[in-house]
Amino acid sequence: METTFRSALVKNFLGQSPDWYKLAILVFLVVNPLVFFLVDPFIAGWLLVVEFIFTLAMALKCYPLLPGGLLAIESVLIGMTSPDRVGEEIAHNLEVLLLLIFMVAGIYFMKQLLLFVFTKLLLNIRSKMLLSLAFCFAAALLSAFLDALTVVAVVISVATGFYSIYHNVASNRSDGNDGNIDVGDDSTLVSDDHKQTLEQFRAFLRSLLMHAGVGTALGGVMTMVGEPQNLIIAKSAGWGFVDFFLRMAPVTLPVFACGLLVCLLLERFGVFGYGAKLPERVREVLTEFDRQATAGRSKQEQVRLVVQALIGIWLVVALAFHLAEVGLIGLSVIILATSLCGVTDEHAIGKAFQEALPFTALLTVFFTVVAVIIEQHLFTPIIHFVLQAQPSSQLALFYLFNGLLSSVSDNVFVGTVYINEARAAFENGVISLKQFEMLAVAINTGTNLPSVATPNGQAAFLFLLTSALAPLVRLSYGRMVWMALPYTVVLTLVGLLCVQFTLAPATELLTQWHWLTLPSIEAATH
């Protein structure tokens, strides 16, 4: 039967996605202008936010860039926002985009070192509880000084390496060369036993990825360089590095301890998708791979590992002291790693950018949705409600509403909007300087902690969800939400209790010890 133009067009639209999914996106595209022009732009704006979250939730059906991009283009065409506003949002977040483009590519060129270090870690720590704790703690420690996206990129690179090694062996490709095999194709596996082992290995990797992902949130909230919005809040409040850490400590340290405890309990009782152990067959494969790699490592390869280790030290120092924009530091890593490790072919260099560029494009689309949120004042009623509450209730309300909005929007945007509103209230004499500082802590912790609830709440989680690794280990949107649920509940509740009951007395105590001083009004208002 001859294919008609219409049927060919329908088949081409969103490719292999299910027909019901294609229909849903078409309905969204038809309904949005009708609601915007005939009902209410405010409702249309929230409808767009819900639809965009839907595309993220269905990431395994179709990469969200396509349907999300169509919705974003339409929102600009019908006037929900303007190209200029989108351009402003991209300009405000240029540092994040540069980070994705260059830092993730830079990590790619340190893959040999990362695989070497983490293979030793994986093989030497046989207890899954201790291994999970090590991943969570290491991710938290790194995220306190590096960006969470960088840390997640490292973990993804390592997990992909482990997965590829076993999949190649299970597919009778013991040479470890994954360049010509689709590691997502289980039909190449030689036996059902290998398939069952691979399923257990996937569950093992999923749990480590989630522990590390939550670890980035636990560490990222502690310091002013941990997350982009932290820096904005610190500047607004006039805090330095040590000041910021001490101000947050009454909330972040108890939350950190409880987060590590949750990590141990989840592995101990094997609930919410955790508890899977490293299969012995996989351990044997990785041990043999490590033995062969060690025995066959030439002097040139040893020098590469040393060079990559030195570049890693440069990376940590440069990021910790903010010697340049994060993305530019990533570019320096690319230049140093390729130059000193002998990677000179354009195609070999180009592979490093394959992982991050689709997500960079998706994040740019996300900034269009954020522009709609700003243009249509979608969060304004919530912000006004919180600011009109009694001072005794403001801390808890700021914390909770920040967490709620950060779960569906951009953390940087939510944190910026709230800190600007709080500062304006202080400048207008509505709240005192002391209350403003307490609110700044509530805003920062509220933006960072409850937002682990959904992948779109944390850029690092979204990056993990849309990475090439996620479908390999069967990590979907729903599964991420389910696995993050115990962390979400504990971190949110402990954070709320600390904000409400321990923040004020602990801050007062630190002030009495002269560890903290109120910044000058000029510092807080500039």
UniProtKB/Swiss-Prot annotation:
Q: Where in the cell is it found?
A: Cell inner membrane
Q: Reaction(s) catalyzed by this protein?
A: 2 Na(+)(in) + 3 H(+)(out) = 2 Na(+)(out) + 3 H(+)(in)
Highest taxon in the source lineage: Bacteria
Keyword annotations for this protein, in alphabetical order, are: Antiport, Cell inner membrane, Cell membrane, Ion transport, Membrane, Sodium, Sodium transport, Transmembrane, Transmembrane helix, Transport
User: What would you give as a GO molecular function for this chain, any one?
Assistant: sodium:proton antiporter activity
Enumerate the transmembrane spans. Answer: 13-33, 98-118, 133-155, 208-228, 244-264, 309-329, 355-375, 395-415, 452-472, 481-501
Q: Tell me what topology the record assigns in the membrane.
A: Multi-pass membrane protein
Q: List the GO cellular component terms.
A: plasma membrane
Biological role: Na(+)/H(+) antiporter that extrudes sodium in exchange for external protons.
- Family as reported in the entry's similarity comment: Belongs to the NhaB Na(+)/H(+) (TC 2.A.34) antiporter family.
The record's listing under NCBIfam families reads:
NhaB (TIGR00774), PRK09547.1 (NF007093)
Descriptive protein name: Na(+)/H(+) antiporter NhaB
Organism of origin is Serratia proteamaculans (strain 568)
Q: Recall the taxonomic lineage recorded for the source organism.
A: Bacteria, Pseudomonadati, Pseudomonadota, Gammaproteobacteria, Enterobacterales
